[in-house]
A protein has these predicted regions:
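C-terminal outer-membrane/trafficking sorting elements
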Residues: 7, 881-960
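Aromatic-rich carbohydrate-binding modules that target alpha-glucans
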Residues: 58-111, 248, 255-303, 311-339
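Solvent-exposed segments in extracellular or luminal domains encompassing
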Residues: 191-207, 930-932
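Basic K/R-rich, polyanion-interacting modules in nucleoproteins and related proteins
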Residues: 226-264, 323-384
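Substrate-binding/active-site clefts of carbohydrate-active enzymes
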Residues: 328-330, 368-544, 551-570, 580-589, ...
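Conserved alpha/beta catalytic core and glycan-binding cleft of carbohydrate-active enzymes
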Residues: 543, 576-723, 727, 780, ...
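Residue-level detector of functionally pivotal "anchor" positions at catalytic/ligand-binding pockets or at interdomain
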Residues: 688, 788-790, 794, 871-891
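C-terminal beta-strand-rich structural cap/linker in extracellular carbohydrate-active enzymes
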Residues: 853-876, 939
Length: 960
């Protein structure tokens, strides 16, 4: 079945396979040519639509095609996604005779010529849970070649010196037959209908082509013979690792764990993809029967590609004897499915996929240059201070690559976040995805860019004091993974399948109730070894600062797919396994961030959060703390279910701040979307369903989220009031999971209004950005925000108190936050901890204050706004304390023609020594921007700058 190679995110559950139905169909005309219109008709009596939850007769065809050699399988361009079929492929229902039909011309439908066979199945719009028919294939053309022995595209395993009998006939009568082996003509027979030939004394692997020519119509069948190399045992050095070990510029070692397999060949560009017995891998019986081979004579720096040909002479029922697969430890794979659609601007000079091969191949290259890291000793922000910005590279900007992030570094820097968390960037199936359908966990997905480009982004972040966290999906793998395919059930013999009972890495059936893809068995030492290699690869080679572990509920072996209660209960094996992975991460980097998306019971989460937290280098695992519903109730203006105390670690009784509280994430509906759809409208002058009104309430959201001690997270463009629904479709429409139309657009690529409409220049959106930037800076720079807190919430006027009694009275040691999410102004009793002067911490000048003589005197807060008071000015952020000479630097200075500034600014003014304004510039000036002053006379000038927060600074400039 073809669904395993597609651009999708499939939900598989234990009971899902029962939903497949075998249909009855007819094709007219039959046989048919590729340029002839055909009609496929499905008997409605053979389908129980209700089994798939279909009530409106919405069925779809999912189709693919083969070339004339019955290879080079390509999906129909209009398939859509497995979870959301394209309407072009919808079948027409004929109620009169209860049939479904679709008509098309193969050349047009598949956008190709030279079609030898087509395949199709019928499915629901969302095919999740195997809501599909059986796979059906149809030969194209009235002239067909029937190969009796061996079968087309088959592989026959023989011993050296044995023979192979080849028999075939055709549907057109007498024809000319030509048999080639490894490109050399072996036999020719003319003007015959039935062909027979025996190839004797075969001593090398053979790639056969049987060409049949009938009056210029040519069909070529391909098949193979692989020689069993017999006993080939060898002990390898203990320094050789799974995957590639580079010895020198001319030598590489390949190691493959393939338990239960009889022998393995390595086929690649270095042997023209025709390996002889010298490329049979040795088996090391002292290291779990791992296979290994030494490749010598490689050209330094030359790109080579390879696959493993893995053979099991006594394969389990429905499992293939031969699997051709890339290396499971690949760091770069080439894909015939995805690579043709990768823009050269994202991945320049992408190596070409080798002609004539199928499925992924691994790239090998000796003599690679090390990346020239600028920052080699990055000091991570403390866990308590983290402001994490979650990013999906695909939806961040129009080019959908790492360069987009690099180009927008000032956007991150000026927001004053100190960590960026990338949704999965490991090699996933397809190009446009959330990334959780990973197949090669050590390989970078090329759609986003090159390895060096990701390293450049990480290095740039570190230069700007920003940590980089990777989201990893290590609870599962998808169908292209070698760890799936080497031990799989492939009942329809299409090269794809599910893990079988012999699979050492993956469970045959999922052992938890939230499974996607195929479920890893983390109790198996081989799986643990693989996971640890993945961790080591990204930490050592990419200087990744931490991992966010997706769906940690899946790391148990104790449950079943339909037992949600078990999955959500405390599981000791899951706790221990994930502690082991955390320990390994900390062994590589004691300050490594370990983050779990568990969203489960507090017993497990507390055990992880408190784990090793009191060491001299504090550890402790950070947990995602979802608070979307409660915060959205506030932003919409509803006085129910709005207790936000769960955003802080005290609510979970954690020893230390290890809860990453958030109001939005990639997996939840946008707060602004719901504000506009369902917001409170009881006050016409403050209608939350009005865009600008809804935006005006989002600064207060930041005030009651980001300030709470402990790590916090922002979902991308929340700081600009992004209102596009999570269910926004490619075309900008919205189709949710509850809409009448089947399917939803949750996983669709999203539009980019934040840049195309220049939201940073929008006053209402820019205010959110600047307010959150100010809050983030307070959070990360002021010690009090690592102190204690209390939250008074459960109404529309939440109050937050933050304090640190260890700080001096001359320091900022108490913070009081008052917010009003009502649609009317409210007088809020502040309950200040003591009387005296309290300063407005949102005023960068430090000049706004109130004199509190009674701590209970109400303070008026207008609808949707907030107040943040401190007992002292922010000593680190006040404009009055903004060091002129040390903070603002011009280079070169003195200068003759131009200078650059070490800060991102929005305004620059040049004054002469008398105070006269000579020159003024406004704009979004990046750090390092060049300013030309050739028009100025020689002498001394005063340069005054202002950034987006309104902070100003001045310094001297000498013009030569």
């Amino acid at each position: 079945m073809k669904k395993n190679i597609l651009y999708l995110f499939i939900l598989l559950t234990l009971g899902s396979y029962a939903q497949q139905q075998n249909i009855t169909y007819s094709v007219s005309p039959n046989p048919f040519e590729e340029n002839e219109t055909i009609t496929i008709t499905i008997d409605g009596n053979s389908i129980n639509e209700a089994t798939w939850g279909i009530t409106d007769n919405s069925l779809y065809i999912w189709s693919w095609s083969f070339d004339l050699n019955l290879q080079n399988i390509q999906d129909c361009p209009t398939n859509g996604m497995w979870t959301d079929s394209n309407e072009t492929n919808k079948l027409t229902y004929n109620s009169g005779n209860d049939t479904y039909s679709i008509s098309f011309t193969p050349n047009t439908f598949y956008s190709r010529t030279g079609i030898g066979r087509i395949g199709f199945l019928i499915k629901a719009n969302d095919g999740s849970g195997d809501k599909k028919s059986q796979d059906i294939t149809l030969d194209v053309g009235s002239f067909q070649v029937i190969q009796n022995t061996p079968q087309t595209n088959s592989t026959t395993i023989i011993n050296a010196g044995e023979m192979l009998a080849i028999n075939a006939n055709n549907t057109g009568g007498n024809a000319n037959y030509t048999l080639r082996a490894n490109g050399v003509v072996l036999d020719s027979q003319s003007n015959i209908s039935t062909y027979s030939y025996t190839h004797t004394n075969i001593i090398d692997n053979q790639n056969y082509e049987l060409e049949v020519n009938l009056a210029g119509n040519i069909v070529t069948n391909v098949f193979n013979v692989i020689i069993d190399p017999g006993s080939n045992v060898g002990i390898m050095p203990t320094t050789y690792e799974d995957g590639i070990t580079y010895i020198d510029d001319n030598t590489a070692i390949l190691v493959l764990y393939a338990t239960g397999k009889d022998f393995v060949y390595v086929a690649g560009s270095f042997n023209n993809w025709q390996p002889d017995t010298s490329y049979a891998m040795k088996k090391d019986v002292t290291r779990n029967n791992k296979f290994w081979i030494e490749l010598t004579g490689l050209t330094p720096g030359q790109i080579e590609t390879y696959q493993y040909w893995v053979v099991d002479k006594t394969a389990a029922t429905n499992s293939p004897a031969l699997v051709k697969t890339a290396d499971p430890y690949s760091t770069l794979v080439l894909s015939p499915f995805d690579d043709p659609f990768i823009p050269s601007t994202s991945y320049p000079n992408l190596p070409s996929y080798p002609v004539g091969q199928e499925r992924e191949v691994t790239v090998l290259q000796t003599g690679q240059s090390n990346y020239p890291w600028q920052v080699t000793n990055f000091q991570k922000p403390k866990k308590e201070d983290l402001i994490i910005y979650e990013v999906l590279v695909r939806d961040f900007d129009a080019d959908r690559n790492f360069q987009d992030l690099i180009d927008k570094i000032d956007y991150f820097k000026n927001l004053n976040i100190n960590a960026i968390q990338l949704m999965p960037v490991m090699e996933f199936e397809g190009n446009e995805s959330w990334g959780y359908n990973t197949s090669y966990h050590m390989a970078l997905d090329k759609f986003y860019g090159t390895e060096d480009k990701l390293k450049e982004f990480i290095d740039l972040c570190h230069q700007n004091d920003i940590a980089v966290i990777l989201d990893v999906a290590l609870n599962h793998a998808f169908g292209r993974s070698p760890m799936v395919r080497m031990w799989m059930n492939d009942s329809d013999n299409d090269g794809w399948g599910q893990p079988n009972s012999e699979n050492p890495y993956l469970n045959e059936d999922a052992r938890h109730s939230y499974n996607v893809g195929y479920d890893f068995d983390h109790s198996n030492p081989r799986t643990k070894d693989y996971v640890k290699r993945v961790i080591q690869h990204w930490v050592d080679n990419f200087k990744i600062d931490g991992f966010r572990w997706d769906l940690t509920k899946g790391f148990t072996q104790n449950c079943t797919a339909n037992d949600e209660g078990c999955t959500n209960s405390y599981q000791a094996d899951r706790v221990a396994i994930l502690k082991e992975y955390a320990d390994y991460s900390w062994s590589l980097d004691p300050t490594h961030y370990v983050i779990f998306e568990h969203l489960g019971g507090n017993q497990e989460e507390k055990e992880w959060a408190d784990y090793r937290v009191n060491e001299s280098e504090p550890k402790g695992i950070m947990l995602w703390g979802k608070m979307t519903t409660n915060y959205n109730q506030l932003t919409m203006g509803y006085n129910s279910n709005n207790d936000i105390s769960g955003v802080g670690h005290d609510s979970r009784n954690f020893i230390a701040p290890r809860l990453i509280g958030y109001a939005e994430s990639h997996d939840e509906e946008r707060l602004m979307y719901k504000n506009l759809q369902f917001g409170q409208q009881s006050n016409p002058s403050h209608d939350v369903q009005d865009l600008n009104t809804a935006l005006s309430r989002m600064s207060a959201l930041g005030a009651v989220t980001l300030t709470v001690p402990g790590p916090k997270m922002i979902w991308h463009f929340g700081a600009l009031g992004m209102e596009n629904s999570i269910f926004t479709c490619n075309n900008g429409s919205v189709n949710t999971d509850s809409d009448a139309a089947s399917g939803d657009c949750k996983l669709d690529t999203k539009p980019q209004p934040q840049w195309s409409n220049n939201w940073l220049a929008d006053t209402n959106r820019n205010k959110i950005y600047n307010d959150w930037a100010r809050i983030n800076l307070l959070k990360t720079e002021e010690a009090v925000f690592e102190g204690n807190y209390s939250i008074d919430s459960g109404n529309l006027t939440p109050k937050i108190y933050i304090w640190d009694d260890t700080l001096l009275s001359s320091e900022l040691k108490n913070v009081v936050i008052l917010a009003n999410f009502d649609v009317n102004s409210q007088n809020i009793i502040p309950n200040f901890p003591y009387t005296g002067i309290w300063y407005d911490l949102m005023d960068p000048t430090g000049t706004t204050s109130i004199n509190i003589t009674d701590t209970s005197t109400p303070i008026n807060v207008v609808a949707g706004q907030f107040k943040m008071y401190g007992n002292k000015n922010s000593q680190t952020l006040s404009t009055n304390n903004y060091s002129l000479e040390s903070k603002l630097t011009l280079f070169p200075n003195p200068t003759k023609n131009s200078f650059t500034i070490n800060k991102a600014i929005s305004k620059l003014e040049v004054y002469d020594v008398s105070g006269k304004l000579i020159k003024a510039l406004s704009g979004d000036f990046k750090k390092g921007e060049n300013f030309n002053i050739e028009d100025l006379s020689n002498g001394m000038y005063i340069i005054k700058t202002e950034n987006k927060l309104g902070t100003t600074a001045t310094t001297k400039l000498i013009k030569l």
